[in-house]
A protein has these predicted regions:
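Sec-dependent signal peptide recognition
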Residues: 17-24
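N-terminal helix-rich structural modules
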Residues: 44-257, 261, 693-695, 745
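C-terminal, non-catalytic "cap/extension" segments appended to globular domains
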Residues: 48-83, 87, 94, 275-277, ...
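Short pre-active-site segment immediately N-terminal to the catalytic Zn-binding motif
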Residues: 512-530
Length: 745
């Protein structure tokens, strides 16, 4: 079977895959390489640092370790277990200064501008900075602390100034422009031509063409935005850490044993022994709202979660949102654009906000119509069983689960017994073998340092030739200081322009650890997310590009490959071989599989509406004049105009919408998940129609060749047409979600 499954009423958010700082590097064209730094004795420095005093010597050694070339096996690996925060600020400042010196050498080159001495030379800059950003990203996302957040706040404006200094270097841009407009470009390979185009656009669209006065204002805006966006993200994290609901044993009604065990462990970590903690994260909130029979507590947990950043205190984000929107609008106005979204989408697949809105609005009516049907089913059960008069937002998941059992005799918790985290990982390796010819071998000799004991590492090889491809790091479990959600990133990307570089990729999740000695069981939705993020890792590992910048992504395309990989979770090969009961070891019964298939489009009204509401509000925020905007009022009025069902809230309310306000990664681009899903649904049909189904070798080879290995070396629209022979069709998406498909006359 192959179906798009939805076994829980809300899908875990696919988090921002490149961490903010990696995206920052891409935008500055610093994903390349750089200054040679003196190689230090890493182990000696580490041993000295671990003695840890606050002396200047310790700071200098910490700085040297952060700047050091990576040593050890696999072309060198990060020393995650040895670096400390002590020297982060001076190391970052030194690396930025070195990078600016490299840029000045290129800008002041007396020779005529060429592809090699300008574009390729830029690709070679920033190696020290790249390494430091890898560590910075770990401290930001995987092991944040109050100490780091102070450093982050200090560095944000400095990083912004650094970026602006490069982007506003007139001599550098003149050289880039000269290459861009030269006859030389015409004889370059298509990939090299695209590198020139991406480099030119990254400057011309980011203030390089402005006069000196406007450049100064542009840089000042960026500096302030960096501060505001950092503050926004830290405020949300503060509310996630501060709000916890503690339960007594008598308040556990309806909760499966696995959830009770996780809640008990969370309470123990917070010195509330004998109680049960529901933390203010999606991974804790979601199952509680699905199963708890305590309606009052459901409301409390729901309010805590959807009020993050919106509590009228020091961590309230509404004023920050208003200022961010105003500054973004002013900044693109300097470039001549009517609004932020028009600027942002110009180089995306959608090309314009109007095209993105048209896609979303074509799906919206079917989504809210389905919500009406879902609510009617839920209310009937709620009245009959509990005497409720209306379904509230904190009831939706709870009664949706009851409807699922009533309509399909399908229990999400029963399915969960077959979803063991370790088995799912092996299933992903199986898919990688069949589609990519990859072989994953765990590195167990301690030769690859990790930043937490939960992290494990695998070497990736070509199964046929044995050629080394890279490493895959996995950090699966939730813990204090780790950002919520799930994401993928790279510590080093594939390139060949200075000798073949291997890939250091990672997947990061927030699964709740099982009880000691017991396997970790996860929901189907979380299993889809697991496969999704692994799809990003495969995209990194399959890269065949020559230059660092060609590893960058197009936002409304970059989720396509990862969304597509979710489909292999529900293939017969995976279900029959890897989805086995955690106690009996028996495979999932055919009767249960049949129920899953029948319920494939269940609750699509909820999942589509909560997502689209966020995407549409994001787009509306970035297409209006934000002067004097009240974000809370704007959100309410926008949803009212959309006729948003009152039983559903946006997946991300504005004060906690980190995708668009803690960085610019998804600003006016949250629609990109649906844009990519059109491609996903259409590509899935190519496999479904092939003789070998989802493991058809010919289709798989085309997938890897045209959609994974090329990264951003080929325009995404051209790449998809090379795979499919035509553009993707939205009708495939509508079929996937069980929505009516309009027949063409």
């Amino acid at each position: 079977i192959l179906v798009k499954l939805s076994l829980i009423t809300i899908k875990r958010e696919y988090s921002m895959k490149p961490q903010f700082i990696k995206a920052f590097l891409i935008s500055s064209i610093l994903m390349g390489c750089s200054t040679a730094t003196e190689t230090i004795n890493v182990q000696y420095a580490a041993n000295t640092i671990n003695k840890a005093t606050a002396s200047v010597k310790t700071l200098e050694e910490s700085k040297a370790l952060l700047l050091a070339k990576w040593q050890g096996p696999f072309q060198g690996v990060p020393v995650f277990d040895q670096v400390t925060l002590v020297g982060l600020v001076p190391a970052m400042e030194q690396a930025m200064a070195a990078n600016l010196a490299e840029i000045d050498l290129i800008a002041n080159n007396s020779q005529a501008p060429t592809f090699e001495n300008t574009i390729v030379a830029m690709e070679k800059t920033g190696r020290d900075l790249n390494r430091i950003f890898t560590y910075y990203g770990i401290w930001r996302a995987n092991k944040s602390s109050s100490e780091f957040r102070k450093i982050q706040t200090e560095l944000a404006p400095k990083l912004s100034t650094f970026s602006s200094t490069i982007k506003q270097n007139k001599k550098l841009f003149d050289r880039i422009s000269a290459v861009y407009n030269s006859d030389e470009v015409k004889v370059l390979s298509p990939a090299k031509q695209r590198l020139v185009l991406l480099t030119y656009n990254s400057f011309s669209r980011d203030g390089a063409t402005l006069n000196d006065s406007d450049k100064a204002r542009y840089a000042k805006i960026n500096q302030r935005l960096a501060q505001l966006q950092t503050k926004f993200g830290n405020n949300v994290l503060a509310d996630e850490e501060s709000y916890v609901v503690y339960l007594t044993k008598e308040q556990l009604g309806g909760l499966p044993e696995s959830i009770v065990n996780v809640a008990a462990a969370a309470a123990d970590e917070r010195d509330h022994q004998g109680e049960y903690a529901i933390t203010n994260t999606r991974s804790s909130m979601d199952p509680f709202l699905t199963y708890s029979t305590e309606r009052t507590l459901r409301k409390q947990v729901w309010q805590n979660y959807y009020s993050r950043g919106d509590n009228g205190d020091d961590f309230d984000n509404n004023a920050i949102i208003a200022e961010i929107l105003q500054l973004r609008h002013e900044r693109v106005g300097l470039l001549g654009y009517k609004n932020y979204a028009s600027w942002r989408l110009e180089d995306r697949m959608a090309k314009s906000p109007e095209n993105a809105i048209a896609l979303m609005e074509s799906v919206w009516p079917a989504a809210i119509a389905r919500v009406d049907e879902e609510v009617a089913d839920m209310l009937a059960i709620g009245k009959r069983q509990d005497g409720i008069e209306q379904v509230q937002a904190w009831d939706y998941r709870f009664y949706a689960e009851k409807v699922r059992k009533d309509k399909y005799d399908l229990d999400s918790d029963e399915v969960k017994q077959y979803l063991q985290l370790n088995n799912l990982r092996e299933a992903m390796f199986y898919v990688a073998d069949r589609l990519f010819n990859f072989n994953f071998i765990e590195v167990t000799d301690g030769s690859v340092p990790v930043f937490h004991e939960d992290v494990r590492v695998w070497e990736v090889k070509d199964k046929t030739s044995g050629e080394h491809i890279g490493l895959w790091y996995l950090d699966p479990f939730a813990r204090k200081g780790k950002r919520s959600g799930a994401w993928a990133t790279t510590y080093r990307s594939h390139t060949t322009f200075e000798g073949k570089k291997n890939v250091l990729s990672s997947n990061n999740s927030n699964f709740s650890k099982g009880v000691a000695g017991q396997p970790t069981l996860i929901s189907w939705s979380d299993a889809e997310t697991y496969f999704h993020e692994f799809g990003h890792a495969l995209h990194f590992l399959a890269s065949k590009v020559e230059y660092p910048t060609l590893n960058s992504g197009v936002r409304d395309y970059t989720e396509f490959q990862s969304q597509l990989l979710e489909r292999w979770l529900s293939t017969d090969e995976v279900i029959n071989n890897y989805l086995v009961h955690y106690q009996t070891g028996k495979p999932m019964p055919k009767a249960l599989i049949a129920k899953i298939k029948q319920a494939a489009t269940f609750n699509q009204g909820f999942s589509t509406t909560e997502y689209l509401a966020s995407a549409l509000v994001d787009m509306k925020f970035h297409t209006v004049d934000p002067t004097g905007i009240d974000p809370d009022k704007f959100e309410r009025e926008t949803l009212s105009a959309l006729k948003m069902p009152k039983q559903i809230v946006m997946r991300h309310r504005s004060p906690q919408f980190g995708h668009i306000f803690s960085s610019e990664g998804y600003a006016s681009s949250y629609y990109g998940y649906m844009w990519a899903e059109v491609l996903t649904s259409d590509a899935a049909e190519a496999f479904a129609q092939a003789p070998g189904g989802f493991y058809d070798k010919d289709v798989a080879d085309k997938l890897v060749e045209h959609l994974f290995s090329v990264r951003n070396a080929v325009d995404p629209s051209e790449a998809y047409r090379a795979f499919r022979g035509r553009d993707a069709k939205v009708e495939a998406l509508m079929r996937d979600r069980g929505f009516p498909v309009k027949t063409k006359k």
